[in-house]
């Protein structure tokens, strides 16, 4: 099969989700003359993890997610991870605000809406933890305005659905931030890609990249591509490749042969949510409320009751309920897990299997749980919830990163991991939450690693897009306040 064109494409983005769309939007502004092409296996963009019903749509800024503020052995609450996540989200907010201001994105309410973020717990020990967490966060510039209460009357004002039907003697506590958001990453992805297409970026739907290999005739890569309509095959050359194919990224990076992927594996976790579109139920709750994971449960198990705004219509979602599927993509193959096993990642995968009994126990418990048991988890948040008003939906597949470790053999990593080749000509993204919310800083950091020789000339443009890039807002309260106020105004959020 011959290479289709003599001149290689400057940039090929594999996968039509939020990561590729974000990277394409950034590169196009840094190098407007570069030829960029996006390949998407399915018939349209944002059909897997970026689809609004395949994720909870939380603009992850650690305002309410308790897994980012663990309690240490000495009783103190560590907020360092929360600060990092919030700093990253502010970079994304600045980039989105820049695109809105320059007309590259239309009305922001099409993809982001103000939604209060609430942490909610019950039980005396959890109430004490919540109080300590609030004390640790309240004076930080990025968490200014956060409120705390253990008064049911006040909590009812913040989130009316949490209180009716609850035992009056149950200790409860909550924190509230009006600065939260709900993000439709599917809409954002499509709008970014639509804008890129208008500017000449090529988007090829229904095209699957089946193999990536080093070019033997020039620097860069050769990609084998199959048109899913008609099944025709082609081979194209690219100078730089980004594999943003979600759960499919591991397979393609393995096929590329880069040594940096050696030892890495993936652990797929499926998920379900309960959803209601009933207007009477939806109007009782307008917030994202995150609880506390059970003792020993993994971070992915944190339960939350979410307002979702998709296509201008409000709904509620509760979950996640975890399950197991060997697929790496929702529309993937049951052989995905088996086909990802290599001699170099077998030891890390076995090490993770033997050292994560809490995760195994959690997954088995979720798989064996009855419908009534699962619904009781929703009633912990909304005591008056009725099964007839809710239906189950299947979320996107999450592939947790199994990372090689010298001491333990392998560790299970929650979050995202960027893999880049030594020469910076190929990169890929593995992992899950809070990926979409932090897409902009992740992609900027990746570009800095892959194109170090260009970064100095790119930096002025980066500063136009993200004025505080490289600065910790937490170290400058005045700058943090100005930045949050500006992006909130542009994006229609609360400050």
Predicted regions and their residues:
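C-terminal catalytic lobe of FAD-dependent flavoproteins
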Residues: 170-179, 187, 324-457
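Short hydrophobic core segments
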Residues: 12-14, 39, 235-248, 443
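Short beta-strand to alpha-helix junction loop
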Residues: 80-93, 121-128, 175-195, 204-206, ...
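Helix-loop-beta segment of a Rossmann-like dinucleotide-binding subdomain
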Residues: 107-120, 157-199, 222, 232, ...
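Flavin (primarily FAD) binding-site architecture
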Residues: 243-259
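Helical element adjacent to the flavin cofactor pocket in flavoenzyme catalytic cores
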Residues: 170-240, 437-451
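Glycine-rich FAD pyrophosphate-binding loop
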Residues: 28-52
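Dinucleotide-binding Rossmann-like beta1-alpha1 core, especially the glycine-rich loop
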Residues: 57-157, 314-315, 325-327, 333-336
């Amino acid at each position: 099969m011959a290479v289709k064109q003599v001149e290689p494409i400057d940039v090929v983005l594999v996968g039509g989700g939020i990561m590729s769309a974000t990277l394409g939007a950034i590169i196009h502004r840094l190098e407007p003359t570069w030829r960029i092409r996006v390949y998407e296996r399915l018939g349209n963009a944002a059909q897997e993890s970026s689809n609004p019903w395949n994720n909870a749509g939380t603009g992850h800024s650690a305002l309410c997610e308790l897994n980012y503020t663990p309690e240490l052995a000495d009783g103190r609450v560590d907020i360092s991870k929360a600060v990092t996540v919030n700093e990253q989200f502010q970079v994304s907010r600045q980039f989105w605000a820049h695109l809105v201001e320059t007309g590259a994105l239309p009305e922001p309410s099409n993809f982001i809406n103000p939604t209060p973020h609430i942490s909610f717990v019950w039980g005396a020990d959890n109430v004490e933890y919540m109080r300590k967490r609030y004390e640790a966060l309240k004076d930080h510039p990025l968490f200014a305005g956060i409120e705390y209460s253990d008064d049911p009357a006040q909590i009812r004002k913040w989130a009316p659905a949490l209180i009716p039907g609850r035992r009056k003697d149950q200790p409860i506590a909550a924190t509230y931030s009006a600065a939260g958001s709900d993000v439709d990453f599917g809409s954002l992805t499509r709008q970014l890609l639509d804008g890129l297409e208008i500017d000449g970026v090529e988007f090829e739907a229904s095209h699957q990249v089946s193999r990536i290999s080093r070019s033997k005739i020039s620097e860069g890569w050769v990609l084998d591509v199959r048109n899913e309509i008609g099944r025709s095959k082609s081979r194209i050359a690219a100078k730089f490749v980004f594999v943003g194919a979600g759960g499919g990224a591991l397979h393609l990076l393995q096929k590329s042969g880069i040594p940096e992927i050696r030892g890495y594996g993936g652990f797929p976790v499926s998920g379900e949510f309960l959803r209601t579109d009933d207007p009477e139920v939806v109007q009782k709750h307008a917030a994202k409320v995150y609880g506390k994971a059970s003792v020993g449960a993994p971070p992915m198990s944190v339960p939350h009751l979410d307002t979702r705004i998709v296509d201008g219509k409000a709904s509620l979602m509760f979950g996640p309920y975890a399950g197991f599927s060997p697929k790496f993509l929702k529309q993937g193959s049951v052989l995905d897990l088996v086909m990802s096993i290599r001699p170099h990642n077998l030891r890390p995968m076995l090490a993770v299997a033997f050292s994560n009994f809490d995760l195994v126990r959690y997954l088995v418990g979720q798989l064996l749980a009855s419908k009534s048991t699962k619904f009781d988890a929703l009633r912990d948040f909304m005591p008056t919830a009725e099964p007839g008003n809710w239906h189950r939906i299947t979320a996107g597949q999450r592939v947790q990163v199994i990372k090689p470790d010298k001491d333990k053999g392998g560790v299970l990593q929650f979050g995202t991991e960027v893999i880049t080749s030594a020469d910076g000509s190929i990169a890929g993204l593995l992992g899950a939450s809070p990926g979409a919310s932090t897409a902009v800083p992740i992609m900027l950091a990746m570009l800095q690693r892959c194109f170090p020789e260009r970064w100095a000339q790119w930096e002025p443009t980066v500063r136009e897009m993200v004025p505080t890039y490289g600065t910790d807002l937490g170290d400058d309260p005045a700058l943090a306040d100005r930045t949050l106020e500006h992006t909130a105004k542009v994006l229609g959020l609360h400050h």
